[in-house]
């Protein structure tokens, strides 16, 4: 949400890792308490994530807003090079927002004594769309695989059904 807005949508709550029963097991495991090493790792993750969000994402986002915003150049008047700069700025803002939120979430979990899986793995260096999907919001794609794609039959029921299942997952992810 913006500073001027108090409206929150589903996108404001879906950038953190999605945990299933693996985390529930940690709730009952007495050995999974917070240790000094885990707290240090958690604090580092949180601080680096906060820096990515506040210093990088917000600053780069301001550039995007200056280019397309009402007080800025505006889409109707933007030159081609400036439009490309805006596209790159927006892509980097998304990247650092998501990376920052994911690291902050994992850092807080570690501070509380929990181990959460990595949720983000440098997706912009991917060599294909498939690899990009596997690197961006890792836990969300795993959730859709485990709870939608595989129960529908995955790739075990022929090519046509596999394409249909993939389409349903893509439609469900928005």
Residue ranges, per PLM feature:
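Membrane-embedded transmembrane alpha-helical bundles that form the catalytic cores
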Residues: 1-174
């Amino acid at each position: 949400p913006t500073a001027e807005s108090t409206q929150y949508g589903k996108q404001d709550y879906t950038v953190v890792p999605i945990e299933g029963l693996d985390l529930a097991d940690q709730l009952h495991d007495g050995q999974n308490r917070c240790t000094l090493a885990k707290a240090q790792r958690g604090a580092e993750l949180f601080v680096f994530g906060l820096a990515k969000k506040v210093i990088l994402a917000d600053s780069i986002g301001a550039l995007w807003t200056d280019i397309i915003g009402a007080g800025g150049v505006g889409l109707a008047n933007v030159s081609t090079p400036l439009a490309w700069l805006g596209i790159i700025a927006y892509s980097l803002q998304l990247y650092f927002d998501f990376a920052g939120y994911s690291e902050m979430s994992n850092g807080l979990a570690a501070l509380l004594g929990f181990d959460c899986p990595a949720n983000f793995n440098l997706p912009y260096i991917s060599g294909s769309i498939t690899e990009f999907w596997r690197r961006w919001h890792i836990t969300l794609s795993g959730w859709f695989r485990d709870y939608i794609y595989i129960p529908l039959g995955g790739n075990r029921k022929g090519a046509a059904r596999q394409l249909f299942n993939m389409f349903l997952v893509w439609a469900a992810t928005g």
